[in-house]
């Protein structure tokens, strides 16, 4: 016969939630630093899309 599970305490929920938040924060920081290092290594702080000359023509 099926028995209901015990209820998880609020402190355990909070601890697990904080661990999850820290993991996501550090992955965001790591990916951001990777993007920064790649943009500086290519010489452009903000890389432009293909076919973009940077000059506008007046018609």
Curated annotation (Swiss-Prot):
* Pfam families documented for this protein: Ribosomal_L32p
Task: State the Gene Ontology terms under molecular function.
Answer: structural constituent of ribosome
Keywords associated with the record: Chloroplast, Plastid, Ribonucleoprotein, Ribosomal protein
**A GO biological process this protein is involved in?**
translation
Q: Where is this region: Disordered?
A: 37-59
Query: Per the record, what is one GO cellular component?
Result: chloroplast
Domain of life of the native organism:
Eukaryota
Location, primary (coarse class): plastid
Name its cellular compartments.
Plastid, Chloroplast
Q: Which family does the record assign? A: Belongs to the bacterial ribosomal protein bL32 family.
Recorded protein name is Large ribosomal subunit protein bL32c
Lineage of the source organism? Eukaryota, Viridiplantae, Streptophyta, Embryophyta, Tracheophyta
The gene behind this protein is: rpl32
């Amino acid at each position: 016969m099926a028995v209901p599970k015990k209820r998880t305490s609020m402190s355990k929920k909070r601890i697990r939630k904080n661990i999850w938040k820290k993991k996501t924060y550090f992955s965001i920081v790591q990916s951001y630093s990777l993007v920064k290092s790649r943009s500086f290594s290519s010489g452009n702080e903000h890389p432009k899309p293909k076919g973009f000359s940077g000059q506008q023509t007046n018609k």
